[in-house]
Amino acid sequence: MKIESISPVQPSQDAGAEAVGHFEGRSVTRAAVRGEDRSSVAGLARWLARNVAGDPRSEQALQRLADGDGTPLEARTVRRR
């Protein structure tokens, strides 16, 4: 089989945005345009800056995760009521 040409798949105009998850009470959808991805990442960065800035333990845990250390995730405990 020989491939003559390749072009990116264009999203259908009538296909509505499909929710793929939730974050902070909002549904998260796949962005059709690359610029929308950037604004979503920027929004997440702003949220992290606001909510983590005052807590040194959270900052340290996020830094360890950014450095590739998974112990903050492994060390989580489940609260029991």
Swiss-Prot record:
Q: What does this protein do?
A: Acts as a negative regulator of the type III secretion regulon (T3SS) expression. In the absence of inducing signals such as low Ca(2+) or host cell contact, the T3SS/injectisome is expressed at a low basal level and exists in a quiescent state due to ExsA sequestration by ExsD. ExsE binding to ExsC disrupts the complex between ExsC and ExsD, thereby allowing free ExsD to bind ExsA. Upon inducing signal, ExsE is secreted allowing ExsC to bind ExsD. In turn, ExsD cannot bind ExsA and prevent ExsA-mediated transcriptional activation of the type III secretion system.
Q: Name one GO molecular function term.
A: protein-folding chaperone binding
Biological processes annotated in GO:
cellular response to calcium ion; negative regulation of protein secretion; protein secretion by the type III secretion system
Question: Which species expresses this protein natively?
Answer: Pseudomonas aeruginosa (strain ATCC 15692 / DSM 22644 / CIP 104116 / JCM 14847 / LMG 12228 / 1C / PRS 101 / PAO1)
Superkingdom of origin: Bacteria
- Gene Ontology terms, cellular component aspect? cytoplasm; extracellular region
Its annotated compartments are: Cytoplasm; Secreted
UniProt subunit comment: Interacts with ExsC.
Region annotation (Disordered) ranges: 55-81
Q: What happens when the gene is disrupted?
A: Deletion mutant deregulates expression of the type III secretion genes.
Q: Which terms are listed as keywords in the entry?
A: Cytoplasm, Secreted
Q: What is its main location?
A: cytoplasm
* InterPro entries, A to Z: T3SS_ExsE, T3SS_Regulatory_Protein
Name of the protein in its database record: Type III secretion regulatory protein ExsE
User: Which Gene3D superfamilies does the UniProt record give?
Assistant: 6.20.290.10
